[in-house]
């Protein structure tokens, strides 16, 4: 009556799974798919500010070295429920996000290419302690009420 799955179907299926980290010869960052137009350049600019500046990388490393593996696993467990109000040990994650964006901002500004402007849409969300999903949730709730 129906179709039976083949081993090739299974191979296709598992090729669509994107874990947080995959072993490759390069760094693949997949945490920001499908952002709105204003945010599209914010995330690559953020990563450029961090990854292309050894002082920025050292600063991030210094901050993150204060945490243990278990702290990150707790954050991973809590963040789908609590979002940016989740805590990494005792710090609310939105405060850590702001600190990271500040590091990236100053790094980009040092380059004198005016690329720090691409971080502005994220700073607007940070100031409001919101994320783009909050807008979608509000719109959805308006439509169903």
Question: PLM features: residue spans?
Answer:
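C-terminal accessory/tail domains of diverse enzymes
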Residues: 1-145
């Amino acid at each position: 009556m129906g179709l039976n799955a083949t081993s090739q179907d299974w191979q296709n299926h598992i090729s669509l799974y994107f874990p947080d980290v995959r072993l490759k010869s390069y760094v693949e960052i997949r945490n920001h798919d499908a952002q709105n137009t204003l945010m599209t350049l914010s995330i690559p600019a953020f990563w450029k500010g961090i990854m292309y500046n050894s002082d920025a990388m050292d600063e991030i490393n210094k901050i993150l070295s204060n945490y243990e593996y278990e702290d990150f696993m707790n954050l991973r467990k809590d963040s789908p429920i609590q979002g940016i109000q989740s805590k990494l040990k005792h710090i609310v994650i939105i405060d850590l996000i702001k600190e990271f964006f500040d590091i990236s901002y100053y790094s980009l500004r040092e380059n004198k290419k005016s690329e720090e402007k691409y971080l502005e849409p994220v700073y607007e969300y940070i100031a409001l302690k919101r994320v783009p999903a909050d807008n979608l949730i509000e719109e959805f709730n308006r439509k169903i009420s």
